[in-house]
Amino acid sequence: MGLLCSRNRRYNDADAEENAQAAEIERRIELETKAEKHIQKLLLLGAGESGKSTIFKQIKLLFQTGFDEAELKSYLPVIHANVFQTIKLLHDGSKELAQNDVDSSKYVISDENKDIGEKLSEIGSKLDYPYLTTELAKEIETLWEDAAIQETYARGNELQVPGCAHYFMENLQRLSDANYVPTKEDVLYARVRTTGVVEIQFSPVGENKRSGEVYRLFDVGGQRNERRKWIHLFEGVSAVIFCAAISEYDQTLFEDENKNRMTETKELFEWILKQPCFEKTSFMLFLNKFDIFEKKILKVPLNVCEWFKDYQPVSTGKQEIEHAYEFVKKKFEELYFQSTAPERVDRVFKVYRTTALDQKLIKKTFKLVDESLRRRNLFEAGLL
């Protein structure tokens, strides 16, 4: 009898423990669900090369702990790959221009640098790039300074030369040092194509301040073959941050050299605006790469882009830059309202001028985004 009572007590104790564990699990699930409700999801979208991944890295630097030494070191092979890819593009581009351009002679690499060029082009063709040694860096620097390569670089928009080219070419000796550890700035310039989805959680005014919202930002692969993978993220998103590289009005796609990048951006923005799951979603449009745009607009007419063919310059210098920017901004605003159902025109839509590499500007922009979304939440709660 005593044995039976003891056994029953053990069973009862086990049941009580299981019940307590189950209750604790349910409590934690409930708490996590409540916590999730206070986290606003932001979807960072844009065509390839729009600068959105640089903005994503800026958020990590600005509103999180940044990159630790291990993370910085993980970018070393990426940066070295960017260097080899860039010099190959410039070398091969100069050969192509030397064969096909009317003014072909200025694209002919000097005899003393031809062997170096062929060697570096071969390295750039490999899947596994070597470590950037001091010797290789000197050879790359020699080729970079060749007049033909500089002429080719001036036409980089036609050759898919990445925006990081000049920065890395001017820092070759530092990048090839045996003890080199990438800096935060190096990481911002590093170009690695986003595939799939990466996310980060942050608050523009700090996690410990009650007035600030907590956001979960998703960066999604921008190239065409990645877009259909976005669909599972669409539902419940508070806002879409759409990046448009306004400097790329005269460039073609990495994936399709017959397609203008600005035309692709226009079509993508229009497609996203019309998605049913975004009917109540706020839209934050980042007109990005303004730093490049303001230099290019003085050399390359805006109306070379089919979408901007009706643009007429009215001035020169700074006035022309502002006039061109306002024209582009108006085009996107018109597209937004044309692609938005009449009953949805009251959803939040803001346009920001951005330069992804400008940390102060990105910090200011995200605080403005935070303010807009908090005001919307207060309005929907009937508090405004």
Swiss-Prot record:
Q: Where is this region: G3 motif?
A: 215-224
Report the InterPro entries cross-referenced here: Gprotein_alpha_su (IPR001019), GproteinA_insert (IPR011025), P-loop_NTPase (IPR027417), Plant_Gprotein_alpha (IPR002976)
Q: Which residues are involved in binding Mg(2+)?
A: S53, T194
Which residue(s) hold a covalent lipid per the annotation (S-palmitoyl cysteine)?
C5
Q: Which residues form the G-alpha domain?
A: 38-384
GO CC term, one of those recorded: cytoplasm
Q: Where is this region: G2 motif?
A: 186-194
The cross-references to Pfam families, in alphabetical order and at most eight, read: G-alpha (PF00503)
Tell me the PROSITE patterns matching this sequence: G_ALPHA
Residues the entry annotates as binding GTP: E49, S50, G51, K52, S53, T54, L188, Y189, T194, G222, N288, K289, D291, A356
**Cofactors required:** Mg(2+)
Q: Which CDD domains match?
A: G-alpha
Quick one: where's the N-myristoyl glycine lipidation?
G2
Task: Give GO terms: molecular function aspect only.
Answer: G protein-coupled receptor binding; G-protein beta/gamma-subunit complex binding; GTP binding; GTPase activity; metal ion binding
Domain of life of the native organism: Eukaryota
* Region listing for G4 motif, in residue ranges: 284-291
Q: Where is this region: G5 motif?
A: 354-359
Assembly, in brief, is: G proteins are composed of 3 units; alpha, beta and gamma. The alpha chain contains the guanine nucleotide binding site.
* Family, similarity comment: Belongs to the G-alpha family.
Role played: Guanine nucleotide-binding proteins (G proteins) are involved as modulators or transducers in various transmembrane signaling systems.
Q: What's the protein called, per UniProt? A: Guanine nucleotide-binding protein alpha-1 subunit
Task: Tell me what organism the protein belongs to.
Answer: Lupinus luteus (European yellow lupine)
